[in-house]
């Protein structure tokens, strides 16, 4: 009987673990005709650190990621965010309550990284930040940058450009965000499974205005 109970418990444990496995999320095509004009978006851009208790819709998430660092010229694979010598060194990690994903710009989808909610690690000691439904974390990949002498500054600049894309998009469609460089980097490196040569640069929590 004891052996049977052990088998039953093990079976349900496996089912539970499988139920927690993340699946690839196919994003919607971006709606390119939405939002304020470019000049109005610049006028409205400001930092906000409070969000409504509501998840982003799939369409808003899809548009946000495309604006951040999506492909806007499919024939060449070039991005909405320029990068040093077009090396496309910036990866965007999408941190949510359900877990963390890596944005695949070519497929315009989210690839699972971990089922752990890492928003508190991104927020560090600023606990209110962890309440944002989505936090985008920009990571540079130094090996992609051929000019190793300037890789540090190039990676930082490229990450900042993606962050600014996020800020302008949010201003243009009425979402709330704030660019931040503070995060628990050592813990995040482990959770995001970063390799040598990958560096956390900046993050943008995003949500609906409260």
Describe the residue ranges of each PLM region.
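Bacterial Sec-dependent N-terminal signal peptides
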Residues: 1-22
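Short secondary-structure capping/junction motifs at helix and strand boundaries
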Residues: 3-4, 75-78, 175-176
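Conserved active-site beta-strand-loop modules that form the wall/rim of enzyme catalytic pockets
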Residues: 10, 99, 132-138
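N-terminal amphipathic, basic helical "cap/leader" segment at the start of enzyme domains
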Residues: 20-132
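Short, small-residue-rich loop/turn micro-motifs
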Residues: 31, 138-142, 208
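Small-aliphatic-rich amphipathic alpha-helix that forms the alpha element of a beta-alpha
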Residues: 45, 64, 92, 134-188
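A glycine-rich helix N-cap at a beta->alpha junction
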Residues: 193-210
